[in-house]
Structure formats: structure tokens, C-alpha cells
Amino acid sequence: LLAQSDCESLSIRELLALEPGAQEDFLDTWLGYSENDGAPALREAVSGLYAQCGPENVLLHVGAQEAIFGALNVLVEPGEHVICQFPTYQSLYEVARAAGCELSLWPLHQGEDGWYCDLDELERLITSKTRLLVLNTPNNPTGYALSADERQRICELARRHGLRILADEVYRGLEAPDAVPPAFCDIYERAFSVGVLSKAYGLPGLRVGWIASQERDAIGALSRYKNYLSICCPTPSEALARIALKHGPAVLARNREIIARNRRIAADFFARYDHVFLHNPPQAGPIAFHGLRPDFVARFGSALAFCEHLAQSAGVLLLPGNVYDMDAPYVRMGYGRANFAENLAVLDGWLQQNG
């Protein structure tokens, strides 16, 4: 597997070992219903990730997917206009479309030095019906990360036009420790930040996500909507999530080290196969969206056909760009797993024979 979007995971035993006495405490976890908004202690821990959002500004969810689904059904009405960054996690625009919203996609562009965004292009997409701007940074699948200046300019644009912002920030924390940008919910009073333990922390089995905003009334509306979804998070997951967040800096540091090591390995690989790939190293996070050179992809007909052939002939899985509704020949590669070098070596061997 070379297509993963998350980071190296931990076992329950490894997670409990981070906290003395945690195993006995975990075995005493009550298996009744949790609170609809989430366990107070866990909401307190999540709020510690933000500067302007206390526990009352945080709503826990079963994963980020539920938070996205709720937000796009509560924050906008059918017929209103939503602008979504593209390419991105499909739910961020497909749920808006399914909810009856008009949709415009704000594309990232391929440049000589990787991906970039055009803020003037974003402003041209805004209409009198626009109500919500949906962002994903660091971005899945490109690894593009909005700069601090771009974030401020987007917030100023949203404020000027009276827009809300829904920011999928599930990879936040994988930037360099001295360069982690403020969350959108901290720098814009009408922004909603989505987080999760699945991606940056590498704990998707816990199924714990959240949404945070300074708009407490909207958080209340999202809480009421959640009553028709999961109702509450599993109490064992909440107990383990508290440990993960308490030791979050160590978990994130480990994952950043894995990504950095794999980036160095990948840089050498792509230098040797420049005739096959357009190398787009991730600016932040564990995933990148690499291009396929025209002469190479022409041998297969499409990125999808190449990925299918690669999976069947070499047992290597890359994710083709058509999964993200991209016609251009791109493949997603994940840098977050400890066995990256081993898996990349299999692709290397195949390319030596077929590249």
C-alpha cells in the first residue's frame, strides 16, 4: 500500500502505555451512553488545541465525516451557493451538492514548484447567493497548505462578503512545530474547524472527530442535528482519545519524523524516475499528488489504467486522480507509514523492468 491518507497507528496497548495507570482506568470505563456533545473531559482536551474556543465551543463527532455531514446540512440551506476548494476530500463538496446547494469548485493549480492557489480566482466565484467557503488544509490529496498570509486574506474576503468558512483541518499538527498555523476558528469568528484523531494522530480506529467554532448558537444547532446521526461517541473511544490528546505532542512528533524520513527516501526515488513522475512533495501532511508524464501514461491510456495494471502486476496500490474527479493524470501517494521504504522498493523494482 502506497496510497494511505493517514499516519502510522498505535495499538491500544501502546496507547495505554503512554499514561501510567491508564490500563486500569480504561478497564473501568462506563459503557453507558456518553453525552450528546461529547464527554466534558474530552471536549476540554480538544479545546486546548484552540485559542478562541473553549469546551462549550466544541462538539464531538464519530469521525470527521459526521462533522462534515452535519455542517453541510446545518450551516447552509438548499439553493444557497457553496464554494469548495478542489481537489479535496469528496464529502466536502458532494454533501453540499446532495443537500441541494449550488456548488462552485475553487481549483488548486499545478505550478513549476508544486501546487498553488489563486485568491483572485476565489473572489470571482463569489455571488450574491454565496454563504459558505469550504477549505481543506493541509490538503488531501495534494499536500498543499495555505500560508498564514493566504489564511488571513481568505478570512478578510469571507468577512467582507458575510461568508462562513468550513475548514477541514484534519492534518493540522503535521507542519513543522514552529510553523503550525492558527486554526481558522481562531482567526475568524464565523469559521468552523474540523479535526479528527484519524489522520495526523494515526488513530482512525477510535472514530473520534470534532468541530469547533466561536459561533456557539451554530454549535448548538449542530448538536441537535447530531441527535439524528450517531447520538454520541463510544465511551471507550472517548477514554482512549483523552490519552491520545494528552500525549498528542509526542504522537505528532513521531509521525512528523516518519513523514520526514519518507520524504527523503521519496526525493531520491523521484529524482531517478523524473521521466515517469512529476514530483510534487507535500508542503505539509502525509500525502502528495504526483503527476504522470504524458509519454509514460500514454502507454496505459489513463492514470486509472496505470494504477489498475500496477496493482495487478506488482501488488502496489496508488490512488488515481479520477477518484478525486480529476481528469489530469495524477496519483496519490502516502508518506505516513513506517513501511513506506519497503513498499516503495517494490514500485522501484517494477519500474526498473517497466519504466
Task: Report each predicted region and the residues it spans.
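A short helix->loop->beta-strand "cap" motif at the edges of active sites that frequently abuts
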Residues: E80, C101, R160-L163, E189
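Conserved PLP-anchoring active-site segment centered on the Schiff-base-forming lysine
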Residues: V74-A96
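Conserved glycine-rich beta-strand-loop-beta hairpin in the small C-terminal domain of fold type I
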Residues: L1, R242, I258-A267, H279-D295, ...
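PLP-dependent enzyme catalytic core of the Aspartate aminotransferase-like
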Residues: Q52, E123-R124, R299, H309-L318, ...
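Active-site phosphate-binding strand-loop segment of PLP-dependent enzymes
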Residues: Q110-A179
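N-terminal small-domain helix-loop-helix segment of the aminotransferase-like
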Residues: L1-G63, G70, L245-H247, N354
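Conserved core segment of the aminotransferase class I/II
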Residues: E189-A260, R264-F269, N354
